[in-house]
Design a protein with these regions (language model features):
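A detector for small-residue-rich transmembrane helices and their helix-helix packing motifs
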Residues: 1-215
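Short, charged juxtamembrane terminal tails flanking transmembrane helices
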Residues: 217-225
Length: 225
């Protein structure tokens, strides 16, 4: 029980720390009257290269940040809880992959916010659970579909608002899907359903042999007397 509670708490450390940084930067931006938008991705221009690494840390408004907070925490917590041994690699790959793809396919302008990370995490958790065919992970896939299935519409220019970076959303989804495939052989795996059955015959044969030897020894002693 204590180990479960500890694991739950540890899985929340990095998500909470990241969210703390996001709010700290937003309050600094507002309080000091700074403009962090130039830390975002500007596609296919040199000034936008740094944004590949920094764009998830910047949000256009407090409302934008508030909208991203809960899904970012929940999805990243799921990643670090269920995939704890490979979570850091996946999170980093989605972060950089989302920024790099946005840099390549985005429309001119500054692309900011952690929405791409959210899409990346959602698509990773969904496809990873399906590909691994492991019941707890499939349950997470279904839960993600139930909670965030509507996100898919904001990946396309036909449904997204003009001010929404649908390219960032699509980039995150692609990065998450690629990670689900690339890391499929790592981390939690479906247990082998035949593992116990393969061991049972050996154990049973050992027990039968033991009983046979005991009976044989008894008969020898009787003849000797």
């Amino acid at each position: 029980m204590k180990q479960d509670v500890r694991r739950i708490a540890l899985a929340a450390v990095i998500p909470l720390f990241l969210i703390f940084i996001l709010y700290l930067l937003k309050f600094l931006e507002v309080g000091m009257d700074w403009d962090f938008r130039r830390l975002g991705v500007y596609p296919m221009e040199q000034r936008g290269v740094f944004g590949i690494f920094a764009h998830p840390l910047v949000h256009g408004s407090l409302r934008h940040l508030l909208a991203n907070t809960l899904p970012l925490f929940f999805l990243s917590w799921c990643l670090f809880y269920f995939y704890r041994h490979i979570a850091s690699y996946i999170f980093f790959a989605i972060w950089i992959g989302c920024g790099a793809l946005t840099f390549l396919i985005g429309k001119p302008g500054w692309h900011i916010g952690a929405s791409g990370i959210i899409y990346g995490l959602a698509f990773f958790l969904f496809f990873s659970g399906i590909l691994r065919k492991h019941v707890p992970l499939i349950a997470i896939s279904l839960l993600v579909t139930f909670l965030y299935g509507g996100l898919i519409w904001n990946m396309f220019p036909f449904f997204a608002k003009e001010t929404t970076s649908w390219e960032g959303h699509l980039s995150g989804a692609i990065a998450g899907t690629i990670c689900a495939i690339a890391f499929m052989e790592y981390g939690p795996q479906r247990p082998d359903p035949f593992a116990d059955e393969e061991e049972t015959p050996d154990e049973e044969s050992g027990e039968e042999g033991k009983e046979y030897e005991e009976e044989e020894n008894t008969e020898v002693k009787a003849d000797y007397n």
